[in-house]
Amino acid sequence: MIKLIENSWQEGVAKNITFIVTKDCQLACKYCYLVGKNEKERMSWEVAKSAIDYILEHEIDFKEESVIWDFIGGEPFLEIELIDKICDYLKIEMYRRGHHWFNSFRFSFSTNGINYDSDKVQKFIKKNHNHLSIGITIDGTQKKHDLNRIWKGNGKERGSYEDVVRNIPLWLSQFPNAGTKVTISSADIPYIKESVLHLYSLRIHEVNINVVFEDVWKEGDDALFEQQLIELADEIIDNGWFQDYACSFFQESIGKPIDTSIDNQNWCGAGKMLAVDAAGNFYPCTRFAAYSLRSKKPIIIGNVHDGIDENKLRPFLALDRTTQSPQECINCEVASGCAWCQGENYDAANTSTVYQRATAICKMHKARVRANNYYWNKLFQKLEEEGKREEFESKHKQTNQEPC
């Protein structure tokens, strides 16, 4: 009756382990936080194998009942041969060791979609389909997508929309419930409404969309953002899109006060996740690797040879809402759903601390909340007029927006 954003696989019980297989990408997206992309740092098989062996040998230290083996870049599918070898080895070793993750694992990818239809990628998908989660990033209309997601190369920059959209039908035929990720920066706010509706027209039923955490926002962006979301709300409700399609900007649970005595968890999973790069270094999250940071030094918590240094990891395990948020955020009447990224917090802080929450999206969150209230008020009024409000309430318990 109403399509809602679905929880991710094994949310809250899965360990996320990320292989940074390459720092190269075909694109040079203008809003990309990866400031140190390059063609040289590619993960070797020896480093990947050492990381796997360390993790599986220390099963007692990884007690989560499930695991998500995540592959990122750059563009991960540039290293499809290495990834295929890694995944084969993981399956063999988890089985051989009788590891508790063998019956509960996923291989996860976020890709630009450009070489999705290549023979090697398709062979890999066919072999591992039942354990795959693949998201293709398409930013909306061609105008919005090509505004930011451009091919790299001095004098060669051009939009990548046509190179991506051609693979959407194939992707959806293989993963019909897959969602896409959309990123909003200041320049493309005017295209939000038409872009979400365009993605719906491509039969992408779940659009996970967010504003960038960096301090890029201009005076008046929040008002324009709110207006775009209200216009989008009208289109979704008036044309019945809400029945089969979902946009993460509209969530019933956001925009409420938070009682930190009950809900004091960290929004971000940094420290509970684990990332490994081409040099074999471990990080609490990919955002703490050097290629993700504008002004701070990377935070390395170990390596594939010496293991994880618990003392370096400890500060991340103590993170929660109150230890890093200014009092204004804790007292905010619309605090729920206001997100943060631990890596951006660290990079934007005026000292080398992970306990200083960046608040660049404050006005944007409040604008989203106002539009979100408009959306749900209008939708509930429509449901009541049609006698369907009670049916909705009985089928859909209120869910919190998922932290990363």
Protein language model regions, located:
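Canonical Radical SAM [4Fe-4S] cluster-binding loop centered on the CxxxCxxC motif
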Residues: E11-E46
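Radical SAM/AdoMet-radical enzyme domain recognition
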Residues: L56-E57, D61-I72, E79-V211
